[in-house]
């Protein structure tokens, strides 16, 4: 679950981290009043969406008058912001952040993720702040410096100093950087985060460090014990199909293709998408119905997949281990009949009672194609999309 920038900065403030004074606003009038609270300009106004690239898309602007603040708010509130990280529809802008402008001397980067290879929280710092860190990692990886947190000791001040020295910081900036490092690490661990990022972390012309931006991603599996974070969830920023899937404990991720995929098991789902791509197709989604693929869940999965107008064919790939394939077949038949599926459905069943399940599909009289294997299934769905 992602948080907005203003929410991230609210957390920073609770942990004593330096950030510009700012207010999240939902109306042009609130935006003007926020500027008055902050004091003399210039100010920075930012669209609050769960996506990067806001500046290049016009969603961040430095303004010198309250009239400009009102104009920015009137232009963006209620609209959708399209960036390189969104789809063509963009993300809805329901709030803008008004904050004091900062005199920037230098931009740095500081962030942390859970590194699955080392099984630790790893902090990354770079002198290349203000740009996509993925681009820096690809083009100049030597400019990214890392430290891993020991799960027994947690963050240590010497690790912050080590990163500060590698960034070329001196004097009081080393102390300030170490404090920010320790604060971010504490937030990460106490709040069960999956990602934390300050890009940019700036050195002001007055010689101080300021968290100019903030990006936080919480671990959705831990929200049951992070109630205040759960209340910060903004469902307007989420794909409605993904939100609907979550209510049925279905793991759904929307993609850009036209072949709907319904699979039991995350690994098999990824493998299914790979083989569809290998045969020239484009998956429209990742959807894992899990081990309990009941008729109700399969029906809901069909509804979610078919709510995407781009879907031209549906591939159902089920491996019957714990679950019996004949019961899955009953669920598929019932779901197709109930939902009224008007696109071809290709089903591959393998494992427990697979032959009986395939026979039930063949005898159903519905527009369901029983594939003989995974390769055959991929070829069938690609052919269906191409009208063959």
Curated annotation (Swiss-Prot):
One of its GO terms (cellular component) is cytosol. PROSITE patterns: ATP_GRASP (PS50975), SUCCINYL_COA_LIG_3 (PS01217). It catalyses: succinate + ATP + CoA = succinyl-CoA + ADP + phosphate; GTP + succinate + CoA = succinyl-CoA + GDP + phosphate. Mg(2+) binds at residues 199, 213. NCBIfam families: PRK00696.1, sucCoAbeta. Binds 1 Mg(2+) ion per subunit. The gene is sucC. The keyword Protease does not apply. Keywords: ATP-binding, Ligase, Magnesium, Metal-binding, Nucleotide-binding, Tricarboxylic acid cycle. One of its GO terms (biological process) is succinyl-CoA metabolic process. Residues 9-244 form the ATP-grasp domain. Pathway: Carbohydrate metabolism; tricarboxylic acid cycle; succinate from succinyl-CoA (ligase route): step 1/1. Belongs to the succinate/malate CoA ligase beta subunit family. Substrate binds at residues 264, 321-323. This is Succinate--CoA ligase [ADP-forming] subunit beta. One of its GO terms (molecular function) is magnesium ion binding. The keyword Nucleotide-binding applies. InterPro entries: ATP-grasp (IPR011761), ATP-grasp_succ-CoA_synth-type (IPR013650), ATP_grasp_subdomain_1 (IPR013815), Succ-CoA_synthase_bsu_CS (IPR017866), SUCC_ACL_C (IPR005811), Succ_CoA_ligase-like_bsu (IPR005809), Succinyl-CoA_synth-like (IPR016102). ATP binds at residues 46, 53-55, 99, 102, 107. Its cofactor is Mg(2+).
